Amino acid sequence: MPVKKGEMVRAIREKLENSVEAKASDTRFPAYLFETKGEVVDIKGDYALVMFGQVPTPNIWLRLDQIESF
């Protein structure tokens, strides 16, 4: 089922840690990506802009296959 704008999601650890994006930067991802709800605020192509509101952090672009409904 595709993710929609406004939906609550979280990152899938296995898919994010083994991604090309992870290999290009620091692979120590913060726990809130996997443990707290994030809201999809925009979708462009294969990527979703996710806002995690429980912690003061910037929004993050994640591939649609790297997130799941929470």
From Swiss-Prot:
Q: Where does the record place it? A: Cellular thylakoid membrane
Provide one Gene Ontology cellular component.
Answer: plasma membrane-derived thylakoid membrane
**Methyltransferase: present as a keyword of the record?**
no
Q: What is its EC number?
A: 7.1.1.-
What GO MF annotations does this protein's record show? oxidoreductase activity, acting on NAD(P)H, quinone or similar compound as acceptor; quinone binding
Catalytic activity from the UniProt record? a plastoquinone + NADH + (n+1) H(+)(in) = a plastoquinol + NAD(+) + n H(+)(out); a plastoquinone + NADPH + (n+1) H(+)(in) = a plastoquinol + NADP(+) + n H(+)(out)
Coarse class of the protein's main subcellular location: membrane
Q: Which InterPro entries match?
A: NdhO
Specify the protein's topology with respect to the membrane. Answer: Peripheral membrane protein
UniProtKB keywords = Membrane, NAD, NADP, Plastoquinone, Quinone, Thylakoid, Translocase, Transport
Entries under Pfam families matching the protein: NdhO
Q: Which family does it belong to?
A: Belongs to the complex I NdhO subunit family.
Described function: NDH-1 shuttles electrons from an unknown electron donor, via FMN and iron-sulfur (Fe-S) centers, to quinones in the respiratory and/or the photosynthetic chain. The immediate electron acceptor for the enzyme in this species is believed to be plastoquinone. Couples the redox reaction to proton translocation, and thus conserves the redox energy in a proton gradient. Cyanobacterial NDH-1 also plays a role in inorganic carbon-concentration.
Q: How does it assemble?
A: NDH-1 can be composed of about 15 different subunits; different subcomplexes with different compositions have been identified which probably have different functions.
Quote the protein name from its UniProt record: NAD(P)H-quinone oxidoreductase subunit O
| The species this protein was found in | Nostoc sp. (strain PCC 7120 / SAG 25.82 / UTEX 2576)
Q: Which gene encodes it?
A: ndhO
